[in-house]
């Protein structure tokens, strides 16, 4: 089977005090294991060992080949593209191309909708003629199912195809441009709402190892130009402190399911030596820059001094820097 690079680079962190680099000896393919028959033993949970390797229950390093499929975060109430293609066929294509891990962007809003059993704000964007399985009657042109029921059909099909799932909170509110919002909370949905949503999700699927991981928040970012919207990383309990928020939310999630991998992305900026988070972004008189900058979610300078601490669940932590190749923007390291 072809080995592909996971789109989001995974750097496991097995020790609370150390940022660890991933190793290069993955050995066991999840897809190959699951392809023979649907898993019914719920024993595919993953962990991180002291060598910063993601391993299975027997300590064997695993090879994760991932892709993303969005839609649930933007208001479609389903994967985008199901308005014209058959969802089951699309999932088969993902598996047939050798992918064994599917990262699915979500919003806090849609998880809370499902948690509370609220009706869909809009009919899921499903073509009921190409997706008769997603209708109440099971016929072409039928009544489209509730979005959570459709989601659970996707989970079932992924389980049968040997595809594992990681959701990420792409934004608090469901919106096509929600990823532009720098933090994990807004005026509409609080940090507590975010934690409640993910804790509910972890509890709901705690007996189903199709759901292997949660990426707590896509691309925390922001600069000192708007300080109350800047994700920072330090030892404070400030509402904008990403480290504190991530540890708090992870504790809620792992209380419900201690087997889940917890992905923690970085921030956008970090203060340079001699400065702190009160500094302006730049002094235009001297053109002095006070922060190290990088991609949204790609800055882990804070983790060196203030590593994420998940306590007894440290073996579930994966630092997940968000990085892009030169086709997006040429960088000096390419």
How would you label these PLM feature ranges?
Residues 20-35:
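Sec-dependent signal peptide cleavage junction
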Residues 73-80, 127-148, 180-191, 219-220, ...:
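The substrate-binding groove and active-site-proximal loops of carbohydrate-active enzymes
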Residues 1-13:
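Bacterial N-terminal signal peptides that target proteins for export
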Residues 83, 195-212, 217-334:
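Extracellular glycoside hydrolase catalytic/binding regions
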Residues 32-103, 114-134, 141:
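N-terminal carbohydrate-binding accessory modules
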Residues 106-114, 151, 155, 160, ...:
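Aromatic-lined carbohydrate-binding surfaces of glycoside hydrolases
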Residues 62-69, 100-106, 110, 164-171, ...:
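Structural recognition of the beta-strand scaffold that forms the well-ordered cores
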Residues 12-22:
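Bacterial N-terminal signal peptides
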């Amino acid at each position: 089977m072809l080995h592909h690079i996971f789109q989001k680079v995974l750097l496991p962190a097995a020790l609370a005090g150390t940022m660890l680099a991933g190793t290069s000896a993955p050995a066991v393919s999840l897809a190959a294991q699951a392809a023979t028959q649907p898993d019914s033993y719920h024993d595919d949970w993953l962990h991180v060992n002291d060598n910063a390797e993601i391993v299975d229950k027997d300590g064997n390093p695993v090879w994760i080949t991932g892709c993303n499929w969005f839609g649930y975060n933007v208001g479609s109430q389903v994967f985008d593209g199901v308005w014209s293609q058959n969802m089951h066929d699309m999932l088969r294509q993902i598996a047939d191309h050798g992918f064994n891990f599917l990262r699915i962007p979500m919003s806090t809003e849609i998880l809370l909708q499902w948690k509370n059993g609220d009706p869909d704000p809009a009919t899921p964007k499903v073509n009921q003629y190409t997706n008769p399985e997603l209708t109440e009657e099971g016929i072409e042109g039928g009544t489209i199912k509730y979005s959570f029921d459709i989601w659970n059909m996707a989970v079932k099909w992924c389980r049968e195809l040997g595809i594992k799932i990681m959701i990420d909170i792409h934004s608090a509110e469901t919106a096509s441009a929600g990823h532009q919002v720098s933090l994990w909370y807004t005026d509409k949905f609080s940090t507590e709402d975010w934690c409640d949503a993910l804790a509910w999700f972890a509890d709901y699927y705690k007996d189903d190892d199709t759901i292997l991981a949660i990426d707590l928040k896509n691309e925390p970012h922001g600069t000192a130009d708007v300080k109350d919207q800047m994700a920072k990383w330090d030892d404070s309990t400030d509402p904008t402190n990403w480290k504190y928020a991530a540890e708090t939310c992870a504790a809620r999630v792992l209380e419900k399911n201690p087997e889940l991998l917890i992905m923690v992305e970085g921030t956008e900026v970090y203060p340079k030596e001699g400065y702190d988070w009160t500094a302006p972004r730049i002094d235009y008189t001297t053109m002095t820059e006070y922060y190290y900058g990088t991609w949204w979610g790609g800055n882990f300078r804070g983790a060196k001094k203030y590593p994420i601490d998940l306590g007894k669940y440290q073996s579930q932590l994966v630092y997940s820097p968000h990085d892009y190749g030169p086709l997006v923007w040429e960088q000096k390291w390419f």
